[in-house]
Amino acid sequence: MAPQPPKRLLRLLHDALAETPPGRCVWVALSGGLDSSLLLMLAAEASQDSGQVLRALHVNHGLQAAAADFETHCQQLCQRLGVPLTVERVAIESLGEGGVGAARRARYAAFAQHVKPGDALWLGQHQDDQAETLL
């Protein structure tokens, strides 16, 4: 039997889903890493009886050799969970900041394009991640 997430965590996610206005969407920014993949899995479970619309958004910057693998992982995970996935492939033009700043701007532009007023955007971050959580 697979381990079950703590009921308290699922309640918190269910409550957060309930705060999104009816008819609006909860988007999970899905990088394909552990944090966002786990967030999507938990959100999918929490949303099963909520009636809330859940979607995932993957931004493929193409900056890593494994970028295609991350995109494939996102597609397979979303298919398995029954969560619609939007993939944005972006071209990073300026690598003057090591690509990080340009990639962040491209990611934010993708968020702005898809996440509409009243929608929610969830980011999977861990304790040591930068303050992008304050988006």
List each language-model region with its residue ranges.
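Core alpha/beta nucleotide-donor-binding catalytic domains of modification enzymes
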Residues: 1-135
